[in-house]
């Protein structure tokens, strides 16, 4: 089983798809990595040689930010926005959508489960 960037890649999948199991690598990035390392994308993960796995590891370490580093960078970007006190930072701080979606209805994913408010007495 190939282990790249701390992730065990699935054996029975094509390497082009298996690389997408690594956080930070999508289909396009996976194709670019395979072109750079001159490995055929239709090769199954278990058919890769140690040399090819080494080339993949080296290419990913050198040119792509993945897993922990990428997660850390994203969280630092969000923290920076919150420290600045800009609109997006305030929305992150309040746990609301920050890309202009409506919040009167919907937005339940960001706001969490609905808190019921007592109705008005007649």
UniProtKB/Swiss-Prot annotation:
Keywords: Ribonucleoprotein, Ribosomal protein, RNA-binding, rRNA-binding, tRNA-binding. Pfam families: Ribosomal_S13. InterPro entries: Rbsml_uS13_C (IPR027437), Ribosomal_uS13 (IPR001892), Ribosomal_uS13-like_H2TH (IPR010979), Ribosomal_uS13_bac-type (IPR019980), Ribosomal_uS13_CS (IPR018269). It comes from the Bacteria. GO terms for cellular component: cytosol; small ribosomal subunit. GO terms for molecular function: rRNA binding; structural constituent of ribosome; tRNA binding. One of its GO terms (biological process) is translation. Residues 97-122 are annotated as: Disordered. Located at the top of the head of the 30S subunit, it contacts several helices of the 16S rRNA. In the 70S ribosome it contacts the 23S rRNA (bridge B1a) and protein L5 of the 50S subunit (bridge B1b), connecting the 2 subunits; these bridges are implicated in subunit movement. Contacts the tRNAs in the A and P-sites. Part of the 30S ribosomal subunit. Forms a loose heterodimer with protein S19. Forms two bridges to the 50S subunit in the 70S ribosome. PANTHER family: 30S RIBOSOMAL PROTEIN S13/40S RIBOSOMAL PROTEIN S18, SMALL RIBOSOMAL SUBUNIT PROTEIN US13M. Belongs to the universal ribosomal protein uS13 family. This is Small ribosomal subunit protein uS13. It comes from Trichlorobacter lovleyi (strain ATCC BAA-1151 / DSM 17278 / SZ). The lineage of its organism: Bacteria, Pseudomonadati, Thermodesulfobacteriota, Desulfuromonadia, Geobacterales.
